[in-house]
Amino acid sequence: MTTAGIRAAVTGAVISAGIALSPMLLTACGGTGITGSGTAATQTRHLDAFSGVDLAASCNVTIQVGGRPSVVVRADDNLLRHVKTQARAGTLTIWTTGSFTTNSPMSVQISTPSLQALSLSGSGAITAGNIQAQRLTVTLSGSGVVRASGTVTHLDVSLGGSGEAQLGQLAARDVHAILKGSGRIVTRATDTLQASVPGSGTIIYSGHPAHVTTRITGSGTVTRQ
């Protein structure tokens, strides 16, 4: 093969590799993409009503229950467009696009009249306060943290991964908790607790429930606080 042929082959290989990697780069959050400007900005999003929040991004989300629906995004001014929010079928979904590095804290502040479901995947954080609901469902996968306070009748919480569900400030009559990973669930039940631990994590409960049922099939534990 001639020198020109070798150069063409190498160039083609590099281009092909770049094409193969591009979807991975586009979906990454952090790395060698866009760098945040360092100038913090806020943007208010006007969305349909919702009672569930699904976070699939590495950012901090604060939810205040009560009042009209409101979503305010805070980030570097050149990164706001990379924070996506969509309300559909009663659930607000938050995610990011592109590869970027932040220089200002990225967060989303939410107000909603009611809250019935929280879902977090990845390494983000959700803090929800003043919850008043008949039933609340909390689903967590990954290494993130969910914190909630208020009062509910029924609480269903499922955790897979190494994250934490800090729900000790959420007074619940009946709690059904499943811990599939190495994380930790802290909860409070006043009547009934059903705790299942097929993983290696820990469920810690308070509230002196009259009826406690535990099922441990892994190396995890269920402990009274």
Q: Each predicted region: which residue ranges?
A:
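Short acidic/polar N-terminal linker immediately downstream of export determinants
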Residues: T2-L80, T91-S111, G220-Q225
